[in-house]
């Protein structure tokens, strides 16, 4: 995390803590990892007044653009729906009700779409894998900038497809909420409990058996 991002993150944390909110969700790891990876988390509380600049959004998209890609096919297509726009309303309306409970606050919703065929019309076998890598890059870049993300799979794909004017060869895989973190007190009591719960992961021995 750069000095600028550290400053933004620190100021934001200080503001929330003065409101009685602790936004620190750093992962507790068994081995050292990059700080930006440890700090990445997926809150539901976003600042409802924040607006992202073109430069900020451009940096997020640039990070996705330079993620790894099978045969350099780059099958991802990213559609930015800024809060207050018609596209944002259409994408928001396509979200599952559980996501709608909080996803109106983030500064923007970014739809991650996979192009499922190659230029010659054959199946793009690694498209879904590659768009996941693009989303991961975007999320880590957001963390480095003092922002947070929350990736959602709960949405009506056909409604999003219609909103974006996509053909049958392009599939929406995720909607990514992006913006500065907000005060969890805006959430329902149930979501506040989930927001404040400690982060957990399966043990290394389970996900990587016999690695040593």
Language model segments and positions:
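Acidic, surface-exposed loops and disordered segments
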Residues: 8-12, 16-212
């Amino acid at each position: 995390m750069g000095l600028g991002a550290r400053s933004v993150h620190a100021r934001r944390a200080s503001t929330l803590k003065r409101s009685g909110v602790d936004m620190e969700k750093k992962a507790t790891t068994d081995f050292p990892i990059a700080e930006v990876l440890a700090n990445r988390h997926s809150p539901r509380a976003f600042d409802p007044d924040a607006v992202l600049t073109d430069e900020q959004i451009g940096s997020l998209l640039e990070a996705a653009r330079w993620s790894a890609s099978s045969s350099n096919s780059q099958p991802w297509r990213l559609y930015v729906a800024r809060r207050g726009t018609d596209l944002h309303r259409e994408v928001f309306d396509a979200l599952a009700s559980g996501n709608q409970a909080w996803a109106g606050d983030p500064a923007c919703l970014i739809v991650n779409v996979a192009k499922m065929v190659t230029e010659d019309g054959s199946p793009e076998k690694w498209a879904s894998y590659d768009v996941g890598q693009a989303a991961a890059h975007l999320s880590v870049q957001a963390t480095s900038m003092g922002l947070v993300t929350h990736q959602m799979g709960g949405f009506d794909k056909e409604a999003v497809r219609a909103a974006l004017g996509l053909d049958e060869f392009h599939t929406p895989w995720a909607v990514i909420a992006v913006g500065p973190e907000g005060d969890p007190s805006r959430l329902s009591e149930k979501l506040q409990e989930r927001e404040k719960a400690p982060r957990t992961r399966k043990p290394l021995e389970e996900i990587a058996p016999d690695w040593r």
